[in-house]
Design a protein with these regions (language model features):
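Conserved catalytic cysteine-centered active-site region
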Residues: 1-8, 35-89
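Condensing-enzyme catalytic core mediating Claisen C-C bond formation in acyl metabolism
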Residues: 1-3, 105-177, 181, 185-188
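Phosphate/pyrophosphate-binding loops at sites that engage ATP/ADP/AMP, CoA/4′-phosphopantetheine
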Residues: 13-29, 185-202
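Buried hydrophobic positions in well-ordered alpha/beta secondary-structure cores of metabolic enzymes
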Residues: 17, 28-31, 49, 73, ...
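Short beta-strand segments
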Residues: 34, 64, 89-95, 113, ...
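Glycine-rich phosphate-binding loops at beta-strand->alpha-helix junctions
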Residues: 34-40, 201-207
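Solvent-exposed alpha-helices and their adjacent loops that cap or buttress functional pockets
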Residues: 53-55, 81-84, 109-113, 124, ...
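Flexible, glycine-rich active-site loops centered on histidine and acidic residues
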Residues: 82-116
Length: 207
Protein backbone atom coordinates (compact mmCIF):
# COMPACT_ATOMS: atom_id res chain seq x y z
CA UNK A 1 0.00 0.00 0.00
CA UNK A 2 0.88 3.67 -0.01
CA UNK A 3 3.82 4.46 2.24
CA UNK A 4 4.79 0.80 2.69
CA UNK A 5 8.24 -0.25 1.47
CA UNK A 6 9.97 -3.59 0.99
CA UNK A 7 11.82 -3.32 4.29
CA UNK A 8 8.49 -2.94 6.12
CA UNK A 9 7.30 -6.32 4.88
CA UNK A 10 10.76 -7.83 5.35
CA UNK A 11 10.86 -6.64 8.96
CA UNK A 12 7.54 -8.32 9.77
CA UNK A 13 8.64 -11.60 8.19
CA UNK A 14 12.06 -11.48 9.85
CA UNK A 15 10.61 -10.89 13.31
CA UNK A 16 8.18 -13.77 12.89
CA UNK A 17 11.00 -16.08 11.77
CA UNK A 18 13.21 -15.06 14.70
CA UNK A 19 10.34 -15.56 17.15
CA UNK A 20 9.56 -19.00 15.73
CA UNK A 21 13.23 -19.98 16.05
CA UNK A 22 13.54 -18.57 19.55
CA UNK A 23 16.35 -16.26 18.47
CA UNK A 24 17.21 -12.60 18.87
CA UNK A 25 18.58 -10.32 16.12
CA UNK A 26 21.91 -10.31 17.95
CA UNK A 27 22.16 -14.08 17.36
CA UNK A 28 22.46 -13.53 13.60
CA UNK A 29 25.76 -13.75 11.75
CA UNK A 30 24.45 -12.61 8.36
CA UNK A 31 21.35 -11.23 6.65
CA UNK A 32 20.52 -11.99 3.01
CA UNK A 33 17.61 -10.26 1.29
CA UNK A 34 16.40 -11.44 -2.12
CA UNK A 35 14.56 -8.59 -3.84
CA UNK A 36 14.23 -6.66 -7.09
CA UNK A 37 12.06 -3.93 -5.59
CA UNK A 38 13.98 -2.75 -2.56
CA UNK A 39 13.48 0.50 -0.69
CA UNK A 40 16.21 2.23 -2.71
CA UNK A 41 18.56 1.59 -5.63
CA UNK A 42 21.14 1.78 -2.87
CA UNK A 43 21.78 1.25 0.01
CA UNK A 44 20.67 -2.36 0.07
CA UNK A 45 17.40 -3.33 1.67
CA UNK A 46 19.38 -5.85 3.73
CA UNK A 47 21.25 -2.96 5.36
CA UNK A 48 17.99 -1.14 6.06
CA UNK A 49 16.57 -4.33 7.58
CA UNK A 50 19.72 -4.92 9.64
CA UNK A 51 19.39 -1.50 11.23
CA UNK A 52 15.67 -1.81 11.88
CA UNK A 53 16.12 -5.24 13.47
CA UNK A 54 18.95 -4.05 15.67
CA UNK A 55 21.39 -6.63 14.31
CA UNK A 56 24.31 -4.22 14.54
CA UNK A 57 27.42 -4.84 12.41
CA UNK A 58 26.04 -8.08 10.97
CA UNK A 59 26.94 -8.78 7.33
CA UNK A 60 23.97 -7.73 5.19
CA UNK A 61 23.59 -7.94 1.41
CA UNK A 62 20.88 -8.00 -1.26
CA UNK A 63 20.56 -10.62 -3.99
CA UNK A 64 18.88 -9.56 -7.22
CA UNK A 65 17.60 -12.61 -9.08
CA UNK A 66 13.88 -11.87 -9.50
CA UNK A 67 11.63 -14.92 -9.10
CA UNK A 68 14.57 -17.21 -8.36
CA UNK A 69 16.05 -14.85 -5.78
CA UNK A 70 15.02 -16.88 -2.74
CA UNK A 71 16.55 -20.06 -4.20
CA UNK A 72 19.75 -18.18 -4.96
CA UNK A 73 19.71 -16.88 -1.39
CA UNK A 74 19.18 -20.39 -0.03
CA UNK A 75 22.16 -21.65 -2.02
CA UNK A 76 24.39 -18.77 -0.91
CA UNK A 77 23.37 -19.24 2.74
CA UNK A 78 24.02 -22.98 2.51
CA UNK A 79 27.49 -22.35 1.08
CA UNK A 80 28.32 -19.80 3.79
CA UNK A 81 27.28 -22.25 6.51
CA UNK A 82 29.05 -25.22 4.91
CA UNK A 83 32.27 -23.20 4.68
CA UNK A 84 32.13 -22.41 8.39
CA UNK A 85 32.06 -18.67 7.73
CA UNK A 86 28.65 -18.12 9.37
CA UNK A 87 26.49 -20.26 11.65
CA UNK A 88 23.15 -18.44 11.77
CA UNK A 89 21.75 -16.67 8.71
CA UNK A 90 18.49 -14.80 8.16
CA UNK A 91 17.23 -15.13 4.59
CA UNK A 92 14.34 -12.93 3.48
CA UNK A 93 12.58 -12.91 0.14
CA UNK A 94 10.55 -9.75 -0.40
CA UNK A 95 9.10 -7.79 -3.29
CA UNK A 96 6.59 -5.01 -3.81
CA UNK A 97 5.92 -5.40 -7.51
CA UNK A 98 2.58 -3.61 -7.43
CA UNK A 99 4.65 -0.42 -7.35
CA UNK A 100 6.46 -1.35 -10.57
CA UNK A 101 3.54 -2.32 -12.81
CA UNK A 102 1.50 -0.21 -15.21
CA UNK A 103 -2.04 -0.64 -13.91
CA UNK A 104 -3.46 0.13 -17.34
CA UNK A 105 -1.64 -2.91 -18.78
CA UNK A 106 -3.83 -5.90 -17.94
CA UNK A 107 -1.31 -8.33 -19.44
CA UNK A 108 1.12 -7.64 -16.61
CA UNK A 109 -0.51 -5.96 -13.60
CA UNK A 110 -2.65 -9.01 -12.76
CA UNK A 111 0.43 -11.23 -12.49
CA UNK A 112 2.38 -9.48 -9.74
CA UNK A 113 1.84 -8.68 -6.08
CA UNK A 114 3.56 -7.83 -2.80
CA UNK A 115 4.82 -10.19 -0.13
CA UNK A 116 7.66 -11.38 2.06
CA UNK A 117 8.88 -14.60 3.62
CA UNK A 118 11.79 -15.35 5.91
CA UNK A 119 13.72 -18.36 7.15
CA UNK A 120 16.55 -18.90 9.61
CA UNK A 121 19.32 -21.26 8.53
CA UNK A 122 21.75 -22.71 11.05
CA UNK A 123 24.67 -25.09 11.03
CA UNK A 124 23.74 -28.56 12.30
CA UNK A 125 25.85 -31.67 12.78
CA UNK A 126 23.07 -33.98 11.62
CA UNK A 127 19.40 -34.03 10.66
CA UNK A 128 17.36 -32.48 7.89
CA UNK A 129 18.68 -29.59 5.86
CA UNK A 130 19.28 -28.31 2.36
CA UNK A 131 20.38 -31.33 0.32
CA UNK A 132 21.41 -29.53 -2.86
CA UNK A 133 20.54 -26.71 -5.23
CA UNK A 134 20.96 -26.24 -8.97
CA UNK A 135 21.28 -22.69 -10.27
CA UNK A 136 21.44 -21.32 -13.78
CA UNK A 137 20.77 -18.19 -15.79
CA UNK A 138 20.19 -17.16 -19.39
CA UNK A 139 20.96 -13.52 -20.04
CA UNK A 140 19.80 -13.80 -23.65
CA UNK A 141 16.21 -13.43 -22.40
CA UNK A 142 16.90 -10.34 -20.29
CA UNK A 143 14.72 -8.06 -22.40
CA UNK A 144 11.68 -10.34 -22.08
CA UNK A 145 11.09 -9.42 -18.44
CA UNK A 146 12.64 -6.22 -17.15
CA UNK A 147 12.21 -2.62 -16.05
CA UNK A 148 13.97 -0.74 -18.87
CA UNK A 149 14.26 2.66 -17.19
CA UNK A 150 16.00 3.78 -14.06
CA UNK A 151 19.34 2.03 -14.38
CA UNK A 152 22.65 3.08 -15.88
CA UNK A 153 21.50 1.86 -19.32
CA UNK A 154 18.51 4.20 -19.33
CA UNK A 155 18.75 6.71 -16.46
CA UNK A 156 15.50 8.12 -15.14
CA UNK A 157 14.40 11.23 -17.02
CA UNK A 158 11.10 12.94 -17.71
CA UNK A 159 11.06 11.32 -21.16
CA UNK A 160 11.61 7.85 -19.70
CA UNK A 161 8.64 8.33 -17.37
CA UNK A 162 6.43 9.77 -20.13
CA UNK A 163 7.13 6.69 -22.26
CA UNK A 164 6.36 4.36 -19.34
CA UNK A 165 9.84 2.86 -19.39
CA UNK A 166 9.94 2.93 -15.57
CA UNK A 167 7.25 0.24 -15.50
CA UNK A 168 7.76 -3.51 -15.57
CA UNK A 169 7.85 -4.95 -19.10
CA UNK A 170 7.02 -8.58 -19.79
CA UNK A 171 6.55 -10.68 -22.91
CA UNK A 172 4.41 -13.29 -21.22
CA UNK A 173 4.18 -16.06 -23.82
CA UNK A 174 7.91 -16.12 -24.45
CA UNK A 175 8.73 -15.98 -20.74
CA UNK A 176 6.31 -18.83 -20.01
CA UNK A 177 7.88 -21.16 -22.55
CA UNK A 178 11.36 -20.22 -21.41
CA UNK A 179 10.59 -20.60 -17.70
CA UNK A 180 8.77 -23.93 -17.90
CA UNK A 181 11.55 -25.53 -19.91
CA UNK A 182 14.27 -24.23 -17.58
CA UNK A 183 12.37 -25.20 -14.42
CA UNK A 184 11.75 -28.74 -15.65
CA UNK A 185 15.41 -29.21 -16.52
CA UNK A 186 16.60 -27.79 -13.19
CA UNK A 187 14.25 -30.15 -11.35
CA UNK A 188 15.63 -33.18 -13.16
CA UNK A 189 19.20 -31.99 -12.63
CA UNK A 190 18.89 -31.49 -8.87
CA UNK A 191 17.15 -34.86 -8.46
CA UNK A 192 19.92 -36.58 -10.41
CA UNK A 193 22.59 -34.92 -8.28
CA UNK A 194 20.84 -36.17 -5.16
CA UNK A 195 20.33 -39.65 -6.57
CA UNK A 196 16.55 -39.26 -6.48
CA UNK A 197 13.62 -39.40 -8.90
CA UNK A 198 10.30 -37.56 -9.06
CA UNK A 199 8.67 -40.57 -7.42
CA UNK A 200 10.80 -40.08 -4.30
CA UNK A 201 9.20 -36.74 -3.51
CA UNK A 202 6.00 -36.06 -1.58
CA UNK A 203 5.56 -32.41 -2.51
CA UNK A 204 6.64 -30.18 -5.37
CA UNK A 205 6.11 -26.42 -5.25
CA UNK A 206 6.71 -24.79 -8.68
CA UNK A 207 6.76 -21.06 -9.31
Amino acid sequence: GEGVAASDLALQAARQALDAAGLAPTDLDAILVATISGDYIWPSTACVLQNRLGANNVMAVDLSAACSGFIYGLSVAQAYIASGRYKTILLVGVDMLTKTVDWSDRTSCVLFGDGAGAVILQARDAGKGVIDTVLGADGSAADLLCIPGGGSRMPMTEEVVQKGKHFLHIEGRKIYKHAVKAMAQATLDVLARAGKTLQDGNLMVPH
